[in-house]
Curated annotation (Swiss-Prot):
Subunit and partners: Tetramer of two alpha and two beta chains.
HAMAP family attached to this UniProt entry: Trp_synth_alpha
Name this protein carries in UniProt: Tryptophan synthase alpha chain
Taxonomy of the source species: Bacteria, Pseudomonadati, Thermodesulfobacteriota, Desulfuromonadia, Geobacterales
Gene3D superfamilies recorded: Aldolase class I (3.20.20.70)
Annotated keywords: Amino-acid biosynthesis, Aromatic amino acid biosynthesis, Lyase, Tryptophan biosynthesis
Amino acid sequence: MSRISDRFASLKERGEKALVTFVTAGDPDLATTEKVVLELERAGADLIELGVPFSDPMADGPTIQLSSDRALASGTTLPAILELVSRLREKTQVPIVLMGYFNPIFAYGSERFAFDAAQAGVDALLVVDLPPEEAAELKGATDSCGLDLIFLLTPTSDGSRIASVARQGSGFIYYVSVTGVTGARSAVADDLAARVTEVRGALELPLVVGFGISTPEQAGEVARAADGVVVGSALVKYFEKYQGAELLEQLGGFVSALKQGVLKGSR
């Protein structure tokens, strides 16, 4: 059983849904990211998504694009992110997902990257621009290393796509709540709960919902239907305003509030 499966199983036993938090690795630098991950876990995050910065993040809105730019400007590389995860594994067993685009993995080499990521203590990869039908090579590599490979579903995914993702994915399935790019929204889509319930019925893996969730109230609303809630852009915005100890304090307070929202939605 993977760390991710273990975490979802223990949450299910307690009748809780998962809070998944996203931050960009290396924003503003990797030393800060290390402290941030530990603070996110302390404040209530159940899983951590670390964004791999990329120069052309087509699925991301301006908040995460700017975060990616800051991380690249500080010299963040894929090998350095793996070194960060290795350091974190000396301090925490929180499940860590690397989320990003296929180009940096392709440049690194899929098999070598999967091996190195597993050795570092990464639990899963989520490659935004790699659909199941193009993922055979990476899937083989992750399977051989014991890494989960997470795929996306969207509001426009049909039955065959849902079946394909259910067959090939592991860890959990990530449901994108809205079409378009990442970014905080003022409200959750009216039909989200019904659609999530429908999709969830076709899956054995946990279904987490992300894109656009920015308040504890929205997190609770989504948690009523899903197995977990992802918050990204709303967290990343704090990196534009704060730094150092104040950044950690602000992030911790916000994540604690999000966790309370998720707990309310779990009941």
